[in-house]
Amino acid sequence: MESVLAQLFKERKQDEFVGGMPYYGQRLLGNRRWVGVTLASAFIVYALFNVPSQTFNIFTALGMLADTATGQASGRQSALYYGIALVLVSSCAWLILGGIRRVTHWTNRLVPGMAAAFCGLSLLIILLNIAAIPDFFALVLGGAFAPDALFGGSMGIALAEGVRRGLMSNEAGQGTITMAAAVADNDHPCEQGFVQAMGVFFDTLVICTLTGFIVVLAHLWTGSASSAEWAAASAARLDVYVASVQALTPAALDRTLVILVSTCYALFAFTTLLGMISFAEISANLISRSPRFILGIRVLGSLVFVPFGALTVLAGLELGNLWAITDLSNILMVYINIPLLLLGAPLVYRALAHYRAADGGRFLSATIGVQTTHWVASEQTHLPDTEETSPR
């Protein structure tokens, strides 16, 4: 639904589209500019404050990759970590300052490959332990319907963790992925709704399920068969996952698989970081399209918040409180976005009815009783097929 609204109310900026939750929020709430500026500002703050946590994830993954490859543990004050910081800041600056088209040019090449590699590696590990699959289902179903899980604190803890990690994984209903939906060049708004729905399915039911299989099969996430150490597992997510991979993999393959899994994890975090800053830039266009203002957002993300995240790692600081802030900000974005979805639902249903009646044919916003800047006869042209643009 939110992706369809993002498509409906997107706007054209030279050779690219901009849009998302602040844009459709402004239109749905009376087209008041102050509403759009407020929503855009809220998202920019949200996105930029998520950057340090992703920076931390990148360091964690690359540090583990290097430790596994060399067989030696590297401290945060080592030359390795300073090298990671230098490469990370430089690559982010080059990509972000080059504009959204440059970011999408590279992420479109990284994301499919890393997703396919991660799924393939996960399936390989599961197949290597296929004899333990019945134990997996017995543990999951037995734990879910045990009296202490149903009526005790375990259910509440599991539910809270599930909601937080679910939002973190697919962002459904949160409004924070709508900027990506808006920039897509579609023939009908509902097309992007179907694409984003598949994204939620893939993130949650494929990626998360494969990860869960490995963690539960290894059974390293519990102190005992009946007592889950949630706090410890939450504080060391990648450590627990990598240890699970090692426990389930033959000794001849464990180092190779850990290196590959760590690489996938680092790429996931890196592309998420790029996405957050790019989405902040898209939202900033609603406040001002001044080239200086947009450049300022790019600089703030790539040369302030990314280095800040790197410095927190090099200083040896733990980001437990930052994760708590991230979880809170995710919930706040849901509370902002859900009322907007309720307001926009009639338009989405009308657009879907048109999509079915016209079999995905030409769409004009006037057919569902709303005027937009893009879905009019004079704007029905596709974007030029260019992959990179210089900073504007």
Language-model regions, residue ranges each:
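Flexible loop linkers connecting adjacent transmembrane helices
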Residues: 1-30, 224-249, 282-288, 350-360
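Helix-loop-helix module between adjacent transmembrane segments
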Residues: 2-15, 21-22, 26-56, 62-95, ...
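Extracellular/periplasmic helix-exit of transmembrane alpha-helices
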Residues: 2-9, 14, 123-139, 182-184, ...
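Juxtamembrane helix-boundary/capping and inter-helix hinge elements in multi-pass membrane proteins
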Residues: 9-19, 28-31, 67-68, 172, ...
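Membrane-interface loop-to-helix entry segments
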Residues: 39, 43, 56-62, 79-128, ...
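Transmembrane helix-loop junctions in multi-pass membrane proteins
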Residues: 49-61, 69-72, 92-104, 124-136, ...
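Membrane-embedded translocation segments of transport machinery
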Residues: 98-182, 200, 243, 250
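A generic transmembrane alpha-helix motif of multi-pass inner-membrane proteins
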Residues: 128, 291-353, 362-392
